[in-house]
């Protein structure tokens, strides 16, 4: 089961990294930059694929759920643990908000 969960996170992160560079682009903009086939490989920065806040939030949500499970929390407790995970994410990204409201 754990390997399936890891696989889901990895596949989601790979898809996010592949599409992150064109997240707010329309089809014509993508084709003009990448050709008729669109994106066929990840843009790497220093050999690393960059993911968006979407993947980061997935990870922090899972972290909150794991913390809640470790503490045998009820639903309300789980929500609080996820909330605290989001605060940890936010505290590392306060300086990083674009004018569009998205994080880098």
Residue ranges, per PLM feature:
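Structured, active/binding-site neighborhoods that engage oxygen-rich ligands
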Residues: 1-104
């Amino acid at each position: 089961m754990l390997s399936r969960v890891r696989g889901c996170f990895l596949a989601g992160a790979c898809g996010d990294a592949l599409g992150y560079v064109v997240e707010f682009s329309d089809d014509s903009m993508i084709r003009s930059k990448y050709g008729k086939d669109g994106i066929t490989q990840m843009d790497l920065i220093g050999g690393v694929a960059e993911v968006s806040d979407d993947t980061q939030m997935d990870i922090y949500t899972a972290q909150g759920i794991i913390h809640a499970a470790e503490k045998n929390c009820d639903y309300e407790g789980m929500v609080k643990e996820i909330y605290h995970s989001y605060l940890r994410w936010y505290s590392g990204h306060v300086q990083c908000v674009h004018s569009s409201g998205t994080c880098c």
